[in-house]
């Protein structure tokens, strides 16, 4: 029985990404939001908060299975943000309450400022490994657990954008050493995730969304030539971090433009990054947003090379209206041309 289950899971993992899939993050249930607020007020301790998280994640996984998905995730329910919690667990990274926030379309996301406090590294088992193990226990012959983490490029971007550059320079005289240290940290986390049974890893990467935004030159304080260099730096750190990943671990990149209170952080088609991102990044698949006009057309998909797969993000989470089924089918056929 156990051998059959292991074999079935191996077959399942070869099918990643699946014909219908989801990114991985879900809206927090009310009881989780209440528990987190109580924890921040000192009314709950860490163990009590974890108990509520466990309960909410168990219920979420049951819903994912009930809906017929082959992927299960923890909904990122244990995180304050989709990306920064991961960074906070690295050596040499600090955070504090923000005074300015992160700009989204129409509002500021008041999430912690995150910055270097020393050399970057991972000297112990990353908390996300234990988070993954909790979801892994719910795998069965029909499902594979997916772990989402921010891409190495996202981590690097956090530390080299103009607002962070001066602080980062206190610890790194150039980006090369920083790239190597971040990549080395990721290699350890990925190896530990693999040892815990992870075969489905997703790198969430908003850095490419920033690069295609009309304001990209301002974001990175550079010109067109400089933006191309940033692209090459980002794809290099991503490739360095996943270099040598075992063949049976599927690695995908999810290119995101942000989602906070159903609004976005950046806009722009994939045209300007397609050549570098789709031709040079050594991943197995891409999860790409195409849920509204901000994402542009499907033409850049012509640059996706080799055996890489593409998951089309055609169903939006930013508005409650359900998409027209025939319109979605038509868009799939349109994308298939490229």
What would you call each of these model-derived segments?
Residues 1-6:
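Short, small-residue-biased leader/transition segments that mark boundaries at the very start
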Residues 11-338:
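Domain-level signal for soluble alpha/beta catalytic cores
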